[in-house]
Amino acid sequence: MLESYRQHVAERAALGIPPLPLDAKQTSELCELLKNPPKGEEDTLLHLLRDRVSPGVDPAAYVKAGFLTAIAKKQVKSPIISPIQAVQLLGTMVGGYNVQSLIELLQFPTVSVSDSSETPLVMGGEGKEPIAAYAAAALSKTLLVYDAFHDILELSKTNPYAKRVIDSWAEAEWFTSRPQLPEYINVTVFKVPGETNTDDLSPATHATTRPDIPLHALAMLESRQPGSLETIAELKKKGHPVAYVGDVVGTGSSRKSAINSVLWHTGEDIPYVPNKRAGGYILGGAIAPIFFNTAEDAGALPIQCDVTKLETGMVITIHPYKGRITNEAGELISTFTLKPDTILDEVRAGGRIPLLIGRTLTDKTRQALDLPPSTVFIRPQQPTDTGKGYTLAQKMVGKACGLPGVRPGTSCEPIMTTVGSQDTTGPMTRDELKELACLGFSADLVMQSFCHTAAYPKPVDIKTHHELPDFFSSRGGVALRPGDGIIHSWLNRMLLPDTVGTGGDSHTRFPLGISFPAGSGLVAFAGALGVMPLDMPESVLVRFKGELQPGITLRDIVNAIPYVAIQQGLLTVEKENKKNIFSGRIMEIEGLPDLKVEQAFELTDATAERSCAGSTIKLSVETVAEYLRSNVALLKNLIARGYQDSRTLLRRIAQMEAWLANPVLLEGDADAEYAAIIEIDLNEIKEPIVAAPNDPDNVKLLSEVANDPVQEVFLGSCMTNIGHYRATAKVLEGAGEVKTRLWIAPPTRMDEHQLKEEGVYSVFGAAGARTEMPGCSLCMGNQARVADGTTVFSTSTRNFNNRMGKGARVYLGSAELAAVCALLGRIPTVQEYLDIVANKIHPFAENLYRYLNFDQIAGFEDEGRVISKEEQALLI
């Protein structure tokens, strides 16, 4: 074991990174060696057990906890670990498999100090107290105890050591024992000018390495600013922490892996947790809200401030309590206000997630003891009630908190009804769930998809495809299968109206209810605990009026939102001192009540590109009821096909049917207040609007970009639905091979099946299209990619530099316009486009833009059945 491990250490050292944590098999072999250690290897073996085994409910932690428990109970002996030291090591495992052992050890017969001549490993000198005292000390700093809290509370009535634990939790000693943030902090600046998106920090081409934090961090900024890692290493020689600084920081979707990479290079090791770092300082003129929250979760200190006077190599002093930044001469160069109110406590606790868990544990303990709330913590300051009405979003979040509504600025923990995870973030979410000691989800429905890696899987992806389904379904989650399609296209069909959720993908933007996308750590928290911390954002109302003009599509309406905001001075494309009215706020959309839910998602989905915290759209009861009837049929079909967890699917079906029996939707109040109101007159939009290379905010009229040659066209992503593919086929029908490389990737297997049944795929074949497996395909650029330096017209979500291909120029627009681009090999003029649409699409629009109503498809519920009808009837 040691020989093979040292070979692995050498391979990783050549890359400048530490070895992987031990797996269960290695840990088991390590435990055997610890019983009879080879001479001279004692320190190495002890280090491996203490520092190189992941905590929580990792399989290796199960082995470690069992071994240490056996030593503590004197069932097994090791010459280098005493029973008391074993208890102390159990206390470093954060929760999960160690908890029950420590509770048992609270009651274990006295072990005198003479049982060992070893000095303690962790918690100071051994006195004359029994082993139960050490178990109490270990549990006092263990926060992830879940239902075991009640066992310890009951035991504390008769057991003095259990009483010590309860008293310690009540006094928040887990928190007060940690150092406060100092009055001033000297840091060395590492600045990336302009915008740093999460693709820069966590390149999609390296997505498969994201769970391996040190390895993935080697790719940070490799395209955006080559040589950055060497620069950071050089800056560290000044002897101060390195602060990451940028004008705009953290836009994009890969927040957790991006934060992991930043903190790997600028943060500090977490004791007893291998290959993970916390802390660090991130300064930005603007910091994307989800990225900001993910930094909070990880124990970093994110600061939004003017960074124009900060340059790489400067040594600056941050004064966190004064809100000042000074240079080496003591001159003031920037000011800031720390947000949220609790940020100092978050940093002290090691992150927002540990603070929330620990503070809840302290509050629960004090409540059980009839003590007043602790004054140790900075409590969130709640806003003054204005007496005005609530917006739709405020009512939805209020409902999830048991309130009529929630005001902006309110700190709350809404119930998470639906949680989504996908396959490039799922392995990180799994690791976070293990660290949170989660063995069962508290959120009502947690879904895992396999949409980003199914088409061209690497060996590590195949491993993920095999392991993640059981991991999620064994905890009560719903696991999709590779080839099923895109997370959002599926998760939307599992939603309940007027509820709140989240997902580990920035495009988790529910068209029913509201969602607040999050990094993998917070998604794991939401799944494990069933709630999520939220500082309620303000809302921006986008109100449409008028009628869609000929040739204008919903994607043009999506792009009209930033277009109008730019005209009104509410949004700028430039990154320095960027203005964005939507950033960190909820976009609430009205004026299009009769859209189908599939169409509505185009609008809510694109709020990710506006850096919104969330979004709502006002729809009619009839629209929502039609969608839910279809979704009931789909979920019943999943049960018939053997999808797990069937109990979760059955529960969601029952909830949908209950809503259909009494279909009522929340509505915003007429006197609700908004940070801004933007009115868009559809009658004034006479030509398509596209996002030009390479920024989703860089929107232009078609007439401004006409005749630009296009080499590749992509029709796919969560922004598409079945109508787009029918319309594209109609444009291409009878035209022979197109003049571009054309990629086709439907969002789900159901779309693909229906399109094949209708003969649409034969048109794609005749056009020379490359048809892809249902899923994300080119959108994220983590597998297939366009040619280097090419110009692309795409229906996907984002057009960041190098995302779809190295040096690619990417336009974003409608499927209909994409089809015309493929036909012509260039962006058409307005008249060319309108003529083609008028002749090839408008006459057939009613038939083309039909949506998948599964309840109306004969025999659909029995398609792919592997569970007999009798078995299914018994389940139901």
Predicted regions and their residues:
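N-terminal alpha-helical segment
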Residues: 5, 64, 82-83, 98-99, ...
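Amphipathic alpha-helical packing elements
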Residues: 2-31, 36, 343-356
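Fe-S-dependent hydro-lyases/dehydratases of central metabolism
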Residues: 105-106, 116-124, 129-876
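Amphipathic alpha-helical scaffolding segments comprising HEAT/armadillo-like alpha-solenoid repeats
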Residues: 24-33, 55-74, 95-123, 144-156
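Short, 15-30-residue, compositionally biased linear elements
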Residues: 1-8, 96, 332, 336-338
